[in-house]
Amino acid sequence: MNNFLVKVASTIEKFNMANKSERLLVCLSGGADSVTLLLCLYELGYDVCACHVNHHLRGEESDRDQHFCEKLCEKLGVELKVFHADVVGYCKEHSVSTEEGARKLRYDFFDSIGADKICTAHSLSDCLETAIFNLARGTGLKGICGIPPVRGNIIRPLINCTRQEIEGFLKERGQDFVTDSTNLTDDYTRNKICLLYTSDAAD
């Protein structure tokens, strides 16, 4: 078994995340992290299905991501459920930010599917970003701890994996993924902090 797969399998076992009798829902955006998560759980023999949320916030790019996920799941023979979210309308009605509204709609959709576990592709790199984000907001020690491996029925099998390891896994398999252009801008607070940190770390 590939070293990366061993690491993911060990994380699942260490935190008692899931067993082979459970139905696991992979939240699939088409990005490197979620594609890796789907492939890992599939190759490890878990009963997986996937879901994709088209937020319709990035024009053709949103549709590109959806089509990519559809083709990937078709190739693997994995069931995919697609949800079209009216983020703009929801945010206007409930007076919340785009990020907050999109997140609420996503998780409501995930819950509605009724899988045993919801699998998100948060990585060790995301934990670092979250800790920096929380520090910047002035939160205490709890905030610095970042993202928990398990929260209720939500599990994060890639939580001990770095972005470099994830991209290496995909490169080894010749597996493509999509890139969200908003991750390359500073339109959102989290992205802005991440870009600033990455820029500082590279100096």
Question: Model segments located where?
Answer:
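Conserved small/polar residues in nucleotide/adenosyl-binding loops
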Residues: 197-203
